[in-house]
Structures are given as C-alpha cells and as structure tokens.
C-alpha cells in the first residue's frame, strides 16, 4: 500500500477535484503492474495499473490489487474501475480508504464482493484518508480547500512605509512555498 501511496502523489496538482489515487498489482509476491490517476479526465489508477500489467506481458487474473481509495463504480469521464477489476479476474483487493463521494460510498466495495472478489478494507486507512483530505473536504462541503501564505518583515509589515512593492522573501523561499502549496 505504501508503494500505491507513493504513486498517488505523482498525480497531485493534476487531478483537479478528483482524488489522488495509486494502485499496485501483485502476483506471486512480485509487482506486475502499477498506476496512478495522472490527470483529471484520464484513466483512473486501477485502469492504469491494469494497462501497465498487460504492457509488461503479465496476466492480471488471480492477482492482488492494492489501491489507496475504493474503486469507483459509476460512469463519469471514465467507465467504472470496478468493472475493469472484475473483468481482469483480480482475486483480492486491498483498499486504503473508502470513497465518501455519494456516487461511490461503499458501493464499489459491495460490487466487488458481490462478484466473489475478496476485499480487505482499511489498509493504512488514516494515511490514505489524509492523503486525500482536500478531496474529502470538497466532497463534504462543496467548498475549496483554502490555504493561505503571506510574508512579512521582522517588524510585522507586508510592505515598505512608502507602499512601494518589493520582495520580502528570497528566491529559494519563494520556490519552496510554491512547491509546498502544490503538495498540500
């Protein structure tokens, strides 16, 4: 699951209102496919992992799938991931966190179980939920996750006495802040 979480982070900043999700396929104790949700409107992590698996010449049937968020079970910009998992013959799905989106909310897990797929929930759950705190906030409130940053001088000012604009922080600090805002 930790590898799936690492992969999920690669999508941060590109998925807009969608969650960041990573997926890893394991068969006979070796990784046979990996994927993550790369961009809004693109393939979800599960489908990316299945495509990667097949591109390696591997067969996903009977494999275990580790995914940081419950697979979707509805049609949106892409078909349901549960459908792809079922059709691939995955035998066991390990889920990090339940998707609280009302379009999913446990239904993805239920669909997999109804098809005879073993599902283990809550693997590194707190970490997976934290990874998608921005997504969960948006789903629960329909409001953006707001984070603010400002710089000030040692005496608490944000501009010179004349009001003239000038940099308060150095270039390295500005770069660091830019990167930290992407990786909330």
Please identify what each model-predicted range represents.
Residues 1-15, 31, 61, 75-182:
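Zinc-dependent deaminase
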Residues 17-21, 43, 144-146:
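Short, basic and Ser/Thr-rich N-terminal targeting/leader segments
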Residues 21-26, 150-151:
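Short beta-strand scaffold segments in enzyme catalytic cores
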Residues 34:
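Short glycine-/small-residue motifs
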Residues 38, 68, 96:
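Conserved residues at the C-terminal ends of beta-strands
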Residues 39-51, 168-175:
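A short, polar/charged loop-to-alpha-helix boundary motif
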Residues 50-75:
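Mobile, glycine- and charge-enriched loop segments
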């Amino acid at each position: 699951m930790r590898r799936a979480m690492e992969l999920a982070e690669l999508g941060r900043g590109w998925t807009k209102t969608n969650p960041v999700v990573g997926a890893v396929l394991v068969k006979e104790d070796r990784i046979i496919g990996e994927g993550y949700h790369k961009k809004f409107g693109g393939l979800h992590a599960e489908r990316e992992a299945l495509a990667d698996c097949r591109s390696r010449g591997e067969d996903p049937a009977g494999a275990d799938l580790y995914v940081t968020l419950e697979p979707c079970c509805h049609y949106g910009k892409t078909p349901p991931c549960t459908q792809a998992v079922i059709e691939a013959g995955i035998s066991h799905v390990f889920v990090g966190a339940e998707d609280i989106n009302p379009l999913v909310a446990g239904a993805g897990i239920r669909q997999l179980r109804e098809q005879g797929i073993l599902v283990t929930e809550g693997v590194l759950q707190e970490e997976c939920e934290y990874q998608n705190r921005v997504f969960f906030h948006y789903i629960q409130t329909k409001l953006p996750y707001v984070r603010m940053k400002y710089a000030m001088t040692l005496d608490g000012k944000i501009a010179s006495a004349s009001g003239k604009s000038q940099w308060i922080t150095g270039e390295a600090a500005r770069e660091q802040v830019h990167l930290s805002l992407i990786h909330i």
